[in-house]
Amino acid sequence: VAVTLSSLQWVAALALINNIAASAGISWARHTPWLIVTALLIFVTPLGRLVVGGYAARLLTKGIAPGSYPRAGRIYLRVWAAERIANASGYRSIADATWVNYYARALGARVGDGVNLHTIPPVTGLLNLEDHCSVEPEVDLSGYWVDARHIHIGTIHVGKNARIGARSVLMPGTVIGDNAHVEAGSTVTGSTPVKANARWSGSPAQKVGRSKHRFPDTPPPRRPQWVLGYGLSSLFLALLPLCAVAMGGASMIAFVQAIDIHPFLGMLAAAPAGTLIAFAAYGVCIWALIRLLSLRLTPGVAPVRSATGWRVWFIQRLMDDARTYLFPLYAAQLTPLWFRSLGATVGKDVEISTSVMVPAFVTIRDGSFLADDTLVGGYELGGGWMLAGATKIGKRSFVGNSGIAGPQRKLAKNSLVAVLSSTPKKSKAGSNWWGSPPERMRRVTVTTDASESSTYRPRLRMRILRGAIETLRLLAPITSGVLATAVLATLQVLLLNLGLGVTILLGGVVLIAAGALALLITVTMKWLCVGRHRAGDHPLWSWFVWLNELQDTFVEVVAAPWFFNHTLGTGWIPQYRVTPSWRENRQRRVD
């Protein structure tokens, strides 16, 4: 059902393409009444899918109460189905925007006045957000967790004016008191309530002091016009990739019309070029928008509902989307140039992976390394206010996977922030940090056989070889583009021969077949590039690292959207990992 819901956007786009092509006199097009096409388009827009996904999930989870239930039981299945329906509805496109408050209410959550909810609410609806509380991006509010035999479900309560830092986890049963503050990257277990005015940090979180007054005590003016501004902006963000795809598709149709070839064969032949055109168009749009929004952007505290607050939010959303749709551009030699062109100050020999930041506020010195999923700069929320500030990463410093360097942080040279850790406000040169709140970690010197030419200062020959391998990453979006063309071609055959109704019913089957093919291609690339992974150390400038990044691009760009997104929480993902026993795999779930 969830896959069929996802396929509706494909059918709607196909019907629109057919109507436009039919009006232009193209022979292979079939006209569908505009009333039906309009209804389909409204249904598959972010807002339309939001209503369907929200109320469908609420219907599935109606009557579920806090408690522990068998993993193989009905409650688990209902929650899993609600998650899949919500995912298919495209709820992520409205995260951090005005619409997410309405989506939370549609799920059954209680959302007070002046709440700034910049993350996804739980499908269970067991969430209570009191007036003027703030929840920053990527906070886990799912309200349940799964072990070997049970699913544990609980409520989450966030008090008035409370602040929940980015990438924190609130476990079932969490109670956050009024004016309390949970720092970024923390995990609140729910075993002990967070009292009013307290500041908690860590994983598991514990009290570290009193809540700091980083924002004005009184909320800013309501400014209702910005509610509409945020809402329209989220719709624009959802439509921007489609506009880029439309440019690529138009070039493909023009190619087919210019030569004497069967339309379907011509579209498949033109798919690689059309994909690259769409990829480039989206990149140019992202670059132009970020540069425009960064003009005269100043750090400091500003109302969320203001030009400054909106611009900071918009830029971070664009950067977050870019690392998904422009994934081949990241963790590459071109990545520092990309961030530099967006307005960040980036030194020489810098390595940047899938990092999210407000470029105008970030300085990265020579030889530094930002690993996967790092959050550099960003913003903090509190009582309707937003704080954005400059962040500096010192020379030859390292921020580990999913590390956080918040606004107004400075990491000294030759320093390290460990995986899933936060950066201190100030640090001494040569210091190591881990955890949240960050604590000093003893530095251990490791001797390796790798030379500077394979770590920090590669020779020209190595740069050329790496560039050649990284260029091959474009094969991943091209493969995804060919799959998309094949899906549309198959749906077109169904539309011409069996009609719109049958096409809608079989759309999910077509997507499942495409997902299976995407998985097969990705697995093949994995074995061709790196074979079986074995424990060991490899210098950054080595064939193994380059080829591993190449196969990972296929995982993220081909397998993830076509297969993994539709099979979360099932036994298919562990099976993809080619573990030795199918009997063992049947007991595993990856979400």
PLM regions and their residue ranges:
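Structural signal for interior beta-strand "rungs" in well-ordered beta-sheet cores
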Residues: A104-A106, R110-G202, Q206-K207, F339-R340, ...
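Terminal amphipathic alpha-helical/low-complexity segments used for targeting or macromolecular assembly
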Residues: V1-G108, A196-L342, K428-R577
